Design a protein with these regions (language model features):
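A surface/extracellular/periplasmic glyco- and lipid-processing/surface-interacting theme
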Residues: 27-71, 75, 80-347
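Sec-dependent N-terminal signal peptides of Gram-positive bacterial secreted proteins and lipoproteins
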Residues: 2-25
């Protein structure tokens, strides 16, 4: 009987050892690594962190910018004088120098709201302030908090209005102190794919190695495809768009571009944007562009982007620039030289 008990204990021990070692088999390790590799990199989908939407100055005298490569989503939109401004969205990764920061304009509020973001600006037009108050937007204003949640970089050889910056730690401190919620249940604006999307096989695909997006005589934005790294190198008005801190040229994984009507409403040339409605545009990634549609039904409603077959677009894993152009400005999407005659678009 004792002999049988010993055999029974021995068998059970072997089975337990085998079971404990199951997860350490080479095949299982590979599967775990593959599973981890499929995790979305541009944002952490497992968290419900609320974004910050920061107004960025794009007057040429304010170049270079700081911190924009860590923005997962950027909008570029026309303002008065043919100058553009950016709205840079930060979520999981917020750098310690962002800027330079500029004042608010009314239609930028729409894009902060569609992302359920805390709005960050340094001053604003009277119309923008009126809307911020009436819409009860959570916002952090450099006019109120210079020296506390915003700072001046006086080492820069720039006009004073181009020297305003903030940093991630300051924004988080401000949000807590001002009692803003720091999580969001609204979800991301855009849908992303952990698997690489090949746009070349889609209907209407254009080769897209070089992209020219005209805003005015003052401002043109260009992208050039880097096939080795599968990103677009960003330039503006003939100059590489570089970072003040790193010196590196900014890149984009995804580009969405479309056109809306704009008009001046005051003697300063401040703009109104006819951005509630629908229209057509392009989604560009990995060297190709495909035609899409866009629709925004209210100021706080999310803009919905769809392929021509009616399916919502999915983006490659990486940062995105949304280029909202004035109507009737040049949009040129060009392929490599041998295909350039067939693969260009001008609107």
């Amino acid at each position: 009987m004792k002999y049988l008990k010993k055999i029974f204990v021995l068998v059970i021990s072997v089975l337990l050892i085998a079971g404990c070692g199951k997860d350490k088999l080479p095949g299982n390790d590979k599967r775990e690594k593959d599973k981890e590799a499929k995790k979305l990199q541009i944002v952490d989908e497992s968290k419900d962190t609320r974004s910050y939407a920061v107004m960025i100055n794009n007057n040429h005298q304010a170049w270079p910018h700081a911190g924009l490569q860590e923005s997962y989503l950027n909008y570029e939109i026309i303002t008065e004088g043919g100058i553009t401004r950016f709205l840079a969205l930060f979520r999981d990764s917020i750098p310690e120098k962002i800027g330079s920061i500029r004042s608010s304009r009314i239609y930028f509020l729409d894009y902060a709201m569609e992302n359920d973001a805390i709005y960050v600006h340094w001053g604003g037009s009277k119309e923008a302030y009126s809307d911020i108050n009436s819409l009860k937007l959570d916002h952090i204003d450099g006019m109120d908090y210079e020296g506390k949640y915003f700072f001046r970089d006086k080492t820069l050889n720039r006009a004073y209005e181009h020297t305003g910056f903030t940093k991630g730690s300051m924004l988080k401190e401000a949000a807590t102190a001002l009692g803003f919620k720091t999580t969001s249940d609204k979800g991301l604006l855009l849908n992303y794919s952990v698997d690489e999307i090949d746009l070349s096989k889609m209907d209407g695909a254009l080769k897209a190695d070089d992209i020219e997006i005209e805003y005015s005589n003052y401002q043109t934005t260009n992208y050039k495809y880097d096939s080795e790294n599968k990103v677009y190198l960003r330039s503006m008005s003939g100059e590489a768009h570089t970072d003040l801190v790193t010196g590196k040229q900014y890149t984009a994984k995804n580009i969405i571009t479309y056109q809306v009507k704009n008009s001046s409403y005051d003697s300063y040339g401040r703009q109104e944007l006819d951005n509630i409605g629908s229209g057509e545009g392009y989604y560009i990634s990995n060297g190709y562009a495909v035609p899409i549609t866009w629709e925004k039904t209210c100021r706080s409603c999310k803009t919905v982007y769809k392929y021509k077959d009616g399916q919502e677009i999915k983006l490659n894993d990486g940062n995105t620039w949304i280029q909202i152009q004035p109507l009737n400005k040049v949009l040129d999407i060009t392929g490599n030289k041998e295909n350039s005659n067939n693969n260009s678009s001008e609107e």
